Amino acid sequence: MAFKYLLPLLLLSLLVANCASRPLYRLPSEAKHATKKPLQTSRPYNLAHRGSNGELPEETAPAYMRAIEEGADFIETDILSSKDGVLICHHDVNLDDTTDVADHKEFADRKRTYEVQGMNMTGFFTVDFTLKELKTLGAKQRYPFRDQQYNGKFPIITFDEYISIALDAPRVVGIYPEIKNPVFMNQQVKWADGKKFEDKFVETLKKYGYKGSYLSEDWLKQPIFIQSFAATSLVYISNMTDSPKLFLIDDVTILTEDTNKTYAEITSDAYLDYIKPYVIGIGPWKDTIVPVNNNRLMTPTDLVARAHSRNLQVHPYTYRNENQFLHLEFNQDPYLEYDYWLNKIGVDGLFTDFTGSLHNYQELKSPLPQQQ
């Protein structure tokens, strides 16, 4: 990373640690909206998966700011809750793999075992820590082969702080929050007003003015996609917000967290017809679209064609640049992978850990018009 980015990110980490009670980033006025460069809608979306987490610890403020700087159309996050009911940005329900919680001896007695999606999981869980306690933890890189120099330097951020980063960007940047593990969140966290996790999620979005159907004037001003692996959550919030929603799809052998169906059943024509009134697209694991055997691509399924025939967008996940994530056909070249998915498979957006790489590819192959 160039030095010009390092000092601002380190200074930001200090601000985040000391200003947890409010959004950290100056929110733009209504007048500023009109002067911002608009969201591009002429080519598939560059979706910053947990921020630019190929370079910086995932779901931290610097990772999101870096992704915006590199050209992300949307910054993606996972929403969970703290013990005291504050919505936070963190992918896993436990803290073990992406924070330094194990180094905090004061929390040694917080280790628990919970059943999560039908499996027993042991570790340190977000639902056993207040926001104040979570803010003392430092984020770290999930993968040991990625840059470790920023481990422990950046804290967990709240949903409000994440939104503020997008709203204060120098151009219009969309948000892509996930209603993460809603069954577990509703089991473990109880809000004083009797509301559910999904209620709190939507309330936060409304507080910041997110509304409007896909490509509407309101949506273009503050773009958003709401995502979840739990179809019941997307159906539940459908009467609360008209913001566009996408249904996430995992490996076909896995059971959904909120029903007893496998994702093989979820990708059937009948289920796509059922979910279509509630969503504008699906977000499948890429190997669900194109199966893989011995790291080689098999014959693509017809999932994209069946989704497109129903006017559903397709945003697969996750595109990573490292060799161990690239199938043999791509000869260790992420540009070949982008070309395959965007031009042969024909998807509508890519979730990537390397926003800058995808942006550079798109600018090379399909540069935006000058006004965008």
Curated annotation (Swiss-Prot):
Start and end residues of each stretch annotated as Disordered: 32-58
Annotated keywords: Glycerol metabolism, Glycoprotein, Hydrolase, Signal
Triggers of expression: By phosphate starvation.
Catalyzed reactions: a sn-glycero-3-phosphodiester + H2O = an alcohol + sn-glycerol 3-phosphate + H(+)
Pfam families per record: GDPD (PF03009)
UniProt keyword annotation of Signal present: yes
Tissue: Expressed in flowers and siliques.
BP GO terms, sorted: glycerol metabolic process; lipid metabolic process
Major enzyme class: hydrolase
Gene3D superfamilies, sorted: Phosphatidylinositol (PI) phosphodiesterase
Highest taxon of source: Eukaryota
Residues the record marks as carrying a glycan: N120, N239, N260
GP-PDE domain mapped to chain residues: 44-362
Secretion signal, residue range per the UniProt entry: 1-21
Family: Belongs to the glycerophosphoryl diester phosphodiesterase family.
Protein name according to UniProt: Glycerophosphodiester phosphodiesterase GDPD6
Taxonomic path: Eukaryota, Viridiplantae, Streptophyta, Embryophyta, Tracheophyta
